[in-house]
């Protein structure tokens, strides 16, 4: 397994923190990023305390967004839609030549169970257009519920659709998904992120209808190796 330095921007939240925790357990160096370094350090300390319960060394660090992104080779964006562009703009100079994994979902409260894609069709595709092809933007994790991510003994029962224009970057993210204990599925170019972003609202509607916390998706009919 190739080891990465992963900056999780928005790692103080439920999804980002859960991903950070599982990647750290898998042996990656993880840096929590936040607008305020103090919040990032506090979140890192909390996550390291959880790792200690599993006899894993405290390997999660915390820093301001720009510093975290500068130190990483893979940057993961897990901020709310309203903060997406501002966060990307803040760290733009630190992203050149790197893989940016964007988990943004264009949810517009209060109707989060209704699909409301932006005018351009995809929030993540808009970030690729903003950054240019010098940054390898990959869309992933929109269909993964944060509900059980911090419970390291809980198996997350879903696949992860991975979209991006750069195939090697997609391969990197599919491998990182596997390190979480999940299956990553190559789902085409960044334009297809519109479909994965829309799925989140569909899954929220399913959760509400069936009174469950973490409905997910499975892709069937693939070769066993996939």
Role assignments for model-derived ranges:
Residues 158-226:
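Active-site-lining helix/loop region of Rossmann-like oxidoreductase modules
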Residues 2-5, 97, 157:
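Phosphate-coordination loops involved in phosphoryl transfer and adenosine-cofactor binding
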Residues 54, 59, 63-99, 106-111:
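Rossmann-like NAD(P)-binding element
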Residues 1-49:
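NAD(P)+-binding Rossmann beta1-loop-alpha1 motif at the extreme N-terminus of oxidoreductases
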Residues 80-83, 143-144, 166-168:
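Short beta->alpha connector loops
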Residues 62, 136-140, 185-187:
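General beta-strand structural signal in soluble alpha/beta enzymes
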Residues 104-147, 151-152:
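Rossmann-fold NAD(P)-binding glycine/threonine-rich loop
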């Amino acid at each position: 397994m190739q080891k990465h330095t992963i900056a999780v921007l928005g790692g103080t939240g439920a999804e980002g923190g859960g991903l950070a925790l599982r990647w750290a357990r898998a042996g990656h160096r993880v840096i929590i990023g936040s607008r305020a370094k103090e919040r990032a350090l506090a979140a890192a300390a909390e996550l390291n305390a959880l790792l200690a319960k599993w006899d894993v060394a405290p390997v999660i660090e915390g820093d301001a967004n720009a510093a975290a992104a500068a130190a990483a080779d893979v940057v993961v964006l897990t901020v709310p839609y309203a903060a997406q562009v501002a966060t990307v703009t803040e760290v733009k100079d630190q992203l050149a030549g790197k893989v940016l994994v964007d988990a943004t979902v264009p949810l517009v409260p209060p109707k989060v169970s209704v699909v409301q894609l932006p005018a351009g069709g995809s929030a993540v595709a808009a970030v690729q257009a903003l950054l240019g092809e010098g940054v390898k933007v990959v869309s992933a994790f929109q269909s993964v519920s944060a509900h059980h991510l911090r419970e390291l003994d809980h198996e997350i029962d879903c696949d992860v659709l991975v979209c991006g224009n750069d195939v090697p970057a997609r391969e990197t993210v599919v491998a990182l998904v596997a390190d979480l204990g999940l299956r990553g599925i190559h789902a085409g170019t960044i334009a297809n992120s519109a479909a994965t972003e829309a799925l989140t609202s569909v899954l929220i509607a399913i959760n509400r209808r069936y009174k469950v916390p973490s409905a997910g998706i499975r892709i069937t009919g693939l070769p066993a190796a996939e």
